[in-house]
A protein has these predicted regions:
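Non-heme Fe(II)/2-oxoglutarate
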Residues: 2-105, 130, 137, 144-160
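Catalytic core of non-heme Fe(II) oxygenases with the double-stranded beta-helix
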Residues: 93-194
Length: 194
């Protein structure tokens, strides 16, 4: 895990409910796509290919809608580049116990980008399965070996994790959590953009 970088704030942190006009159609579209586990180990679960490759219309309409939250198109011309956009599926490690520490996401930084976000598209998801924005606490230490361990664990499909892998994930979560404190929490609500 790299040291947290202070970046200028181009886009404020926000939450927008009912982002898509017809979210069920978006879910249907997402479910029609192929998903793959990360060979690189940089993210959990499974993702589609980048959407700009074969789904340009959706890609452009999403970005147009997103940037309309920040810019008045009658006064602004926008161009974008280096945009990564995917659908991603993750699942609980222990669906019977939502409080199992293994169900906690791994603290991470989404690269050095001015804007990152997501839209929750799982109906009736546990609201506590949302997203937390974390800040380094007073105990924070730069520990690059934790990033290596995270990558190793993400490379293994969830259904193939051994008991030792799950124990290693638990240790990793505890090690990461001791360095950060929650600053903002977004609950998982269907069709919410954060």
């Amino acid at each position: 895990m790299s040291e947290p970088k202070k970046q200028p704030i181009f886009f404020p942190t926000q939450s927008v409910d009912n982002f898509f006009d017809k979210p069920e159609e978006i879910v249907q579209f997402a479910n029609s796509l192929e998903y793959k586990t990360a060979q690189s180990g940089f993210w959990p679960g499974k993702r589609t290919e980048e959407l700009h490759i074969n789904h340009t219309l959706f890609f452009k309409s999403f970005l147009t809608r997103l940037f309309a939250l920040f810019f008045d198109y009658s006064h602004t011309k926008l161009r974008w580049s280096d945009v990564g956009m995917y659908f991603q599926k993750t699942s609980a490690f222990d669906p019977k116990d939502k409080n199992n520490i293994l169900n906690t996401g791994l603290i991470h930084q989404d690269g050095n980008f001015p804007l990152v976000g997501l839209v929750y598209l799982t109906k009736d998801a546990c609201k506590d399965s949302g997203t937390s924005i974390m800040l380094p606490n007073k105990k924070y230490k730069h520990r690059p070996e934790l990033a290596d361990e995270k990558v190793r664990l993400h490379k293994i499909p969830q259904e193939k994790l051994t008991k030792k892998d799950l124990e290693d994930r638990k240790k990793l979560i505890l090690s990461l959590n001791e360095n950060f404190e929650e600053s903002i929490r977004f609950n998982n609500k269907f069709n919410r953009l954060i």
